[in-house]
């Protein structure tokens, strides 16, 4: 399987997995045009689309792609049923695509119906987990997002985290504002800054590394707890997550 990223809009990535025969899976096609161009350039045969949630920058290209390739099966959560989804999937179900099993993981928070797809090593996590950050809480609660991130963080170390946006640099600036002396965060920030200066993608990331540099995955880390305790005493990791998310919203 080959993993490809297609830039869209200002900072979106549309992920495509293709096999040796050229069959492909498209994830969150917010815009059809760059996908159609990539399909033509690579001679791919689209078989399926995965949708993670209902926001327009993730679903906007579905209908045009299905019109061009009517054989495509569109998988998505209930909230995408009016966005072109033909096969609604929910937590714990399996999507069989390109000869692989993709587990569906419910990750409410960014939206209430948000889901992710995992087939080792690939995790397509939409707007739930970003490198160095997590999605805004447009519909869900901090507790829901905390539990969703906990699920994703428990996946195997070598998981390739395929996020839907290039937010890494701004996320790492926030991480540095919280833990300015953390060596892992400083090292990763420098690496990301260099990549973005060359207009290069920072994704996908390896989950084992992400756990070290993403403050939203470190709510039980003593260094982070000490920082938060300087401002307020919070006993539960869910509360510390909510504190971080609130800080990030105002950053």
UniProtKB/Swiss-Prot annotation:
A GO molecular function for this record? hydroxyacylglutathione hydrolase activity
Q: How does it assemble?
A: Monomer.
- NCBIfam families, from UniProt? GSH_gloB, PRK10241.1
* CDD domains listed in its UniProt record: hydroxyacylglutathione_hydrolase_MBL-fold
Q: What is the lineage of its organism?
A: Bacteria, Pseudomonadati, Pseudomonadota, Gammaproteobacteria, Enterobacterales
Q: Which cofactor does it need?
A: Zn(2+)
Q: What Enzyme Commission number(s) does the record list for this chain?
A: 3.1.2.6
What keywords appear on the UniProt entry? Hydrolase, Metal-binding, Zinc
The reactions it catalyses are: an S-(2-hydroxyacyl)glutathione + H2O = a 2-hydroxy carboxylate + glutathione + H(+)
- Report the protein's function: Thiolesterase that catalyzes the hydrolysis of S-D-lactoyl-glutathione to form glutathione and D-lactic acid.
Give yes or no: UniProt keyword Zinc. Answer: yes
What detail does the entry give on cofactor binding? Answer: Binds 2 Zn(2+) ions per subunit.
Where, in this chain's numbering, is Zn(2+) 2 bound?
57-58, 127, 165
Which residues hold Zn(2+) 1? 53, 55, 110, 127
What name goes with this protein? Hydroxyacylglutathione hydrolase
Q: What class of enzyme is it?
A: hydrolase
Q: Which Pfam families match?
A: HAGH_C, Lactamase_B
